[in-house]
From Swiss-Prot:
GO terms for molecular function: phosphatase activity; zinc ion binding. Keywords: Hydrolase, Metal-binding, Zinc. SUPFAM superfamilies: PHP domain-like. This is Probable phosphatase TTE1963. Its cofactor is Zn(2+). Its EC number is 3.1.3.-. It comes from the Bacteria.
Length: 254
C-alpha cells in the first residue's frame, strides 16, 4: 500500500497587511514570520479598493517600491480583488493588474450580495476565471455563495487557473466552508484541476499556517503536480506562463 503523501509548501499565496484595513501586521512582519517558518516566498494580496477600509488604487501602483526580498524571503506583489458582479468584473483596472504577480479573485459580501442563486454565483466565478489577469479563485467553498462546483472547476482547467484551498476557511473564517472545501478538493483531484494553498493571514502569526489545508490535501492524496506551492521552480514557471498569457515582459514594473 502506498504511503500517505507529505506536502511541504514554499510559498504562501494569500497574505494581508495593515493596508487591508482589518489586518494587523506589516509586510516586514509577515516576511519575518515567513522566514521563521521556512517559506521561500510570500505574496502580498491586500484587498482590492472596493473593500471597505481597503487600500487606495495608488497603493497597488506603488508596490514597485517593495524590495524583491525582505528578511531573505522573496516578495510577490498581488491583490485579493473583489468580484463585483456576475459578469466577473473585479475592482482594479488593467493598467494595475498587468503589473501584479498574483491576482486572487474572491466573492465578499461587502461587494457581492450573498445569494442562494447558484447560477448567479457560478457565473460570477466563471467570468472572473476568464479574465486573463486572474490567477486564483479565492475561498470558493464559502457556503453563503453556493456554486456549481463542477462547472467552476471545468472553467479553471480550461483557462489554466488555480482553485484556492484556503486554510482560514477551516479555522477562523466563513463558517461551514470546512464541509464544502473537501468536496471541491476531491473534485479538483478527480478532474486534474490545479490548486493553490493560502493562509489568508490577517496577522503575521498566521503567515505560513497551512495545517488544515495540508491535512485535507494529504488525506485525499492530492498529486503534488497539481499544487502550485510545492516548489520555487513551479511558481516561477507559472509566473512565466502568465507573462506570456498577458503579453508582459520579465519585469512588469518597467
Amino acid at each position: 500500500m502506498k504511503g500517505r503523501m507529505k506536502l511541504r509548501l514554499v510559498l504562501d499565496t494569500h497574505t494581508h497587511t495593515i493596508a487591508s484595513g482589518h489586518a494587523f501586521s506589516t509586510i516586514i512582519e509577515n516576511a519575518r514570520e515567513a522566514f521563521r517558518k521556512g517559506l521561500q516566498l510570500i505574496c502580498i494580496t491586500d484587498h482590492g479598493p472596493e473593500m471597505p477600509g481597503g487600500p487606495h488604487i495608488y497603493y497597488f501602483g506603488n508596490l514597485k517600491v517593495i524590495p524583491e526580498k525582505i528578511e531573505g524571503v522573496e516578495i510577490l506583489k498581488g491583490v485579493e480583488a473583489n468580484i463585483m458582479d456576475e459578469e466577473g468584473r473585479i475592482d482594479l483596472p488593467e493598467r494595475i493588474l498587468k503589473k501584479l504577480d498574483i491576482v486572487i479573485a474572491s466573492l465578499h459580501d461587502e461587494c457581492f450580495e450573498p445569494s442562494e442563486d447558484v447560477e448567479r454565483n457560478t457565473k460570477a466565478l466563471i467570468n472572473a476565471i476568464k479574465n486573463p489577469y486572474v490567477d486564483i479563485i479565492g475561498h470558493p467553498g464559502n457556503p453563503i455563495y453556493p456554486i456549481d462546483i463542477e462547472r467552476v472547476l471545468e472553467a479553471a482547467k480550461e483557462y489554466g487557473k488555480f482553485i484556492e484551498i484556503n486554510n482560514s476557511s477551516f479555522v477562523t473564517s466563513r463558517r461551514g466552508s470546512e464541509k464544502i472545501c473537501p468536496i471541491i478538493a476531491g473534485k479538483a483531484k478527480e478532474m486534474g484541476v490545479r490548486v493553490a494553498v493560502g493562509s489568508d493571514a490577517h496577522i503575521c502569526f498566521d503567515v505560513g499556517r497551512f495545517d488544515e489545508a495540508i491535512r485535507l490535501l494529504e488525506d485525499i492524496n492530492m498529486p503534488e503536480e497539481l499544487v502550485l506551492n510545492t516548489s520555487v521552480d513551479k511558481v516561477k514557471q507559472y509566473l512565466q506562463e502568465k507573462r506570456k498569457r498577458i503579453g508582459g515582459g520579465q519585469n512588469s514594473w518597467n
